[in-house]
């Protein structure tokens, strides 16, 4: 049997895969402080409220453009809590993104960039997948563009109990298991 040639599939998909930078800005929070040692011995011992400044945080991940008008699917944990989202396209253009919706229980998010005629990847029908069929994982692991790995469909209709990013128990139903390498940043 001839080996499977995935070069055309890889070439067709890399243009629709984007790099996402999600920035959470510094915030000031009021917290109840520990009782001051002198208050403990000599005062009322209640402590004082204090202002703390959180550090800005930046997260990275991948996404895929699913419509020519700029809708992108990514993981919720990539954009959760973000104040600013920057989307870098395969052609190195950077656009501002905004969150349209999130689902922490399935770790999915939909974001939008402004523009039109973006390259897309068609969404397939997972019911038509067969165990043992070849699949590609395309993303930007380690902040590197257009990384492609291959594997097979290992199982279908898997269910797993997990904890969503909001701390709630979640039961993800009917996901596809693959042995394609998924590295940090492929999310």
Residue ranges of each PLM-predicted region?
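Serine-dependent protease modules
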Residues: 1-187
């Amino acid at each position: 049997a001839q080996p499977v040639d995935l070069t055309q599939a890889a070439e067709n998909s890399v243009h629709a895969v984007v790099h996402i930078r999600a920035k959470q800005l510094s915030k000031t929070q009021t917290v109840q402080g520990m009782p001051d040692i002198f208050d403990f011995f000599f005062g009322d011992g209640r402590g004082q409220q204090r202002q703390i400044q959180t550090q800005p945080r930046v997260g990275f991940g991948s996404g895929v453009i699913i419509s020519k008008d700029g809708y992108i699917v990514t993981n919720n944990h990539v954009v959760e809590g973000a104040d600013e989202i920057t989307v870098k396209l395969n052609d190195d253009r950077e656009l501002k993104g905004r969150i349209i919706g999130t689902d922490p229980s399935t770790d999915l998010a939909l974001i939008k960039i402004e523009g039109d005629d973006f390259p897309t990847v068609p969404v397939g029908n997972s019911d038509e997948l067969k165990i043992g069929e070849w699949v590609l994982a395309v993303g930007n692991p380690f902040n590197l563009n257009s990384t492609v790995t291959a594997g097979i469909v290992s199982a279908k209709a898997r269910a797993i109990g997990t904890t969503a990013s909001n701390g709630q128990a979640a039961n993800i139903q009917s996901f596809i298991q693959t042995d394609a390498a998924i590295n940090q940043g492929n999310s």
